[in-house]
């Protein structure tokens, strides 16, 4: 089994893997990434994922599916240089041989002076609605807005 937890992991893997062998089953944590997998490798690839919206997805939802299917003997977990260890640990706890591999590197977002100006102007308007699905994305957002303290308050407090 190969687990691709994000669209970024799919994009990185697709750069190197043009087609998966028939005996490989792919898995991911949600429907959005499943669509990216289908776009990269077609509808015939074996794919396991929790169906539904964000409330029905995530590592925990995929774990429930995998538990009921039985432990995969070997798992290759392809991700960025950081990420939650929870799902690999759960798989190890039921006997899977899990290898976690970094296949892409996250680079911090640095706003240009123009982007800083734009976001500062936006901070004088209505508070944003931001939907973020990973702690790494939260870290990237706060890294990007750190030079503009008013924006951090605007994002965190709705002020």
Give the predicted meaning of each segment.
Residues 1-159:
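Conserved beta-alpha
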